[in-house]
């Protein structure tokens, strides 16, 4: 059986989108977030994004490669003894550099991440614990499960990281970076002149499609 309700959508800009009312259209990207549950009740959680029709069009491959670089960076540095918060932040630096290369962000990479400017494109955390539940033991409280009793950040984006604690041998966790273009959030931040020193809104708004 599935470990959670499958997310299958060409509207990946809507997080946890369970609306299946649309027909897949050529030229769009399809996001699949799905998992299976074993007879022993252990869960899996896999997220993939592929082009409808099998071929990238226009700028899709550029954005896909940024996400891939973020994923590979996380695999490279994730190990026991470091915090998952530090992994998350290093991945965010890769994200910002990739977006700078596309002309969507600007300025100093570390300053942009420290300020939280990257959260326009990644408004959630890198991953979470996984086990008998997809978000393992989350009902006990994220502060206890994901942060070992330490307080969570209240910053937009970073506060949605479900796992920030020091990693230990035997932990099972997900690595789920992404790049999102959320029209409503883009409009809001631009209207507030938010992080104009880091975000190239003029170029960004050409990605609204």
Indicate where each model-derived feature is located:
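Active-site neighborhoods and metal-handling regions in enzymes and metal-associated proteins
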Residues: 1-209
């Amino acid at each position: 059986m599935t470990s959670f309700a499958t997310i299958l959508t060409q509207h990946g800009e809507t997080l946890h989108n369970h609306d299946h009312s649309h027909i897949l259209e050529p030229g769009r990207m399809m996001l699949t977030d799905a998992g299976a549950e074993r007879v022993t009740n252990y869960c899996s959680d896999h997220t993939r994004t592929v082009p409808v029709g099998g071929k990238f069009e226009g700028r899709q491959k550029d954005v896909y490669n940024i996400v891939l670089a973020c994923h590979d960076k996380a695999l490279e540095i994730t190990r026991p003894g470091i915090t998952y918060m530090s992994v998350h932040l290093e991945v965010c630096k890769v994200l910002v550099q990739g977006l700078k290369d596309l002309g969507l962000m600007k300025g100093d990479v570390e300053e942009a991440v420290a300020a939280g400017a990257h959260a326009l494109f990644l408004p959630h955390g890198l991953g979470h614990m996984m086990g008998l539940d997809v978000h393992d033991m989350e009902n006990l409280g994220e502060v206890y499960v994901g942060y070992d009793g330490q307080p969570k950040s209240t910053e937009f984006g970073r506060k949605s990281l479900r796992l920030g604690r020091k990693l230990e041998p035997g932990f099972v966790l997900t690595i789920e970076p992404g790049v999102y273009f959320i029209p409503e959030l883009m409009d809001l931040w631009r209207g507030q002149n938010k992080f104009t020193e880091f975000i190239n809104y003029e170029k960004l708004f050409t990605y609204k499609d």
